[in-house]
């Protein structure tokens, strides 16, 4: 069995005889995956996480980091984290338009500056998702440098 992952060419593979799943970069015990548009799509990523929640494997083997035992609660927490991050973005946009770089500063105040690029791309993936849902709109172009506001 396979499911798509954080990028279109990343997959998860089940090993039923070992009650295990090779989760690749999709689910890692030490970090969340960075969903990078245009190849990475937040809707696809969330759907894949939901699919994993319906599966029964008791151990995940990520590409990076230690194995993850009893992964289902962790996968549910990953979904909750992504949904909360999108709520955080919507909260920022309630008052005024924002650029992604400014959102990174606000949402990740203690993040090492070397990781701001990854955080920006993750926020951009969330923005594209929210834009597809009709929740937000671009005031300029839909890019990493664009200006975004809550849809009117």
Regions found by a protein language model. Name each.
Residues 1-2:
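Extracellular interaction modules
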């Amino acid at each position: 069995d396979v499911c798509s992952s954080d990028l279109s060419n990343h997959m998860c593979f089940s090993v039923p005889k070992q009650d295990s799943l090779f989760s690749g970069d999709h689910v890692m015990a030490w970090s969340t995956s960075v969903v990078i548009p245009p190849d990475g799509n937040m809707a696809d990523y969330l759907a894949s996480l939901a699919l994993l929640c319906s599966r029964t494997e008791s151990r995940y083997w990520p590409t990076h980091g230690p194995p993850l035992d009893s992964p289902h609660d962790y996968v549910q927490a990953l979904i909750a984290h992504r949904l909360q991050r999108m709520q955080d973005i919507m909260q920022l946009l309630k008052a005024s338009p924002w650029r992604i770089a400014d959102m990174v500063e606000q949402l990740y105040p203690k993040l090492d500056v070397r990781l701001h690029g990854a955080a920006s791309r993750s926020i951009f993936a969330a923005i594209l998702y929210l834009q597809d849902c009709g929740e937000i709109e671009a005031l300029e172009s839909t890019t990493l440098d664009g200006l975004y506001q809550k849809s009117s």
